[in-house]
Every structure is written in C-alpha cells, then in structure tokens.
C-alpha cells in the first residue's frame, strides 16, 4: 500500500541544496502542482517550503515569468511570500483530497459543491484582454495579422501567485477527463498524472524512477538463487494532510 503524504512538521524536510529538481511528469499543470510534494526516494520532499520556493516552482512550471517573479519579490514585505506559500500548500492539499476522491471516473455537476474554496480564489483574479504583438514563431507565419488578443493579469499583491495555480486546477476539473487521472503504481510513490497514452497503459510517474525500480524487483523475483540487496528504508506511514485554505 502506498505511503500517505505527512502533515507539515511531521517529517524533517530536506534542505533546498539537497533536494532533487521539482518533478513535472503529470502532463497537466494542475496535477504537477499536487506533485510539488512527494516521496521520490522514500523521503518526503517539499518543493514549496517557503516563498522563494513558490516563486521558483511557478517559474519552472511556466506559470509566471522571471519578470513577474522579480516584481513580486521586490514589492513583498518580509514574510509575506512565506505566508502565500503556506496558503498554496493548503490549497494544494484541499485539491488533492478532491482529486483522490474523484479520480478514475468522469466528473459530474455534483462535484461543484466541494469546489467552493477553489472558486473563491478564482474570483479574486484581475485578468483583462489586451492587443499585443504576435510572437515571431513558425506556426504564426501564415497569420493574417502581426497582432493577437491575449489575456493578461494584474499582479496586484503576492497573493496573486495563487491565481495561476487555481486556474490550472480549474482547467483540469473543467477540460480534462478525470477517468484518465492515475496514481503512480510505485509502492512508495504518491505522484499523480494524466494518462494521455493511446492505449491508456501508463503505470509510472517516470520509467527512470519507479518503472526502473519495478523492473529490478521483478528481476529479483525471477532470480531466487541470487542474494537480494538490502532494501532502502521507506518513510513511515503518516496521516494525509487535512489543511485548509482560508481565502
């Protein structure tokens, strides 16, 4: 049975300079957000431990650019970004409960009743349409105009960082097939993904991580005469996070 993600403070998290890079393996930004905490090697890794982590993760996820990150950092009070990161973690775990409850089958309108917290974040958004120059990309070379209409956002406060996260989760809920949401079959892995394979046969967060471990385990079973290597210690079972966001 899989390990549950522990509550904040139940485990000593790895310090930033020893953490592996954040994992973007879900084929969906909303699920990638849920995967910003995980147990890739049996040890809890939190990639949103503080405000700087949040800015870095959003940039890596391409949900903000470096200019937005720099502007928000420059206009934040001490500790303000850390508070936003705590809200992001709370929103993440609230949405994780929803996904784990509904994954594997299509969503119905009844699910709306438990998405109120997400809607309360979305209603803070300050997006507006603007005419901007069209990027000079190959796919645009036959466009009739060098201009395009794009949705932009006013980043009024550090709390605005929650908006692209909420939008990514809302997109998953409204436009993706929840019957394709799966959890990695690795024994200690809690990562989620959207199975976009043609035959819907994806099993692992990554073949190079959990897929390879499963291959090695299968090989050991087929070779009973060979001594097995001592398995790595796994994180102890802990209760799931039950934190809530306070919009």
What are these regions (language model features)?
Residues 168-169, 188-189, 206:
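Short, hydrophobic/aromatic alpha-helical segments in well-folded domains
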Residues 160, 179-187, 203:
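Cys/His-enriched microdomains
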Residues 188-193, 209, 214:
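Cys/His-rich microdomains that often coordinate metals
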Residues 1-180, 228-247:
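Short helix-coil boundary/hinge micro-motifs
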Residues 200-211:
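Cysteine-rich micro-motifs
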Residues 174, 193-194:
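Active-site beta-strand->loop segment that positions catalytic residues and contacts the acyl thioester
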Residues 211-226:
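Basic DNA-binding region of bZIP-type proteins
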């Amino acid at each position: 049975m899989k390990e549950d993600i522990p509550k904040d403070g139940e485990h000593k998290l790895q310090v930033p300079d020893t953490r592996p890079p954040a994992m973007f393996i879900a084929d969906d930004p909303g699920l990638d957000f849920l995967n910003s905490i995980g147990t890739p090697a049996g040890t809890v890794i939190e990639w949103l431990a503080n405000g700087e982590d949040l800015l870095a993760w959003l940039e890596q996820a391409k949900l903000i650019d470096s200019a937005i990150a720099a502007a928000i950092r420059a206009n934040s009070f001490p500790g303000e970004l850390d508070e936003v990161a705590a809200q992001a973690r709370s929103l993440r775990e609230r949405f994780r409960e929803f996904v784990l409850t509904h994954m594997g089958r299509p969503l119905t309108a009844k699910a709306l009743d438990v998405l109120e917290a997400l809607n309360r974040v979305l209603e803070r958004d300050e997006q507006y349409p603007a005419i901007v120059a069209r990027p000079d990309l190959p796919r645009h070379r036959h466009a009739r105009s060098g201009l395009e209409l794009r949705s932009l956002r006013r980043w009024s406060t550090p709390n605005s960082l929650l908006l692209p996260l909420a939008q990514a989760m809302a997109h998953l809920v409204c436009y993706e097939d929840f019957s394709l949401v799966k959890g990695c079959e690795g024994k200690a892995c809690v990562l989620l993904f959207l199975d976009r394979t043609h035959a819907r046969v994806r099993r692992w967060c990554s073949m190079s991580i959990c897929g390879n471990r499963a291959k090695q385990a299968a090989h050991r079973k087929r070779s009973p005469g060979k001594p097995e290597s001592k398995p790595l210690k796994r994180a102890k079972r802990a209760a799931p996070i039950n934190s809530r966001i306070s919009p």
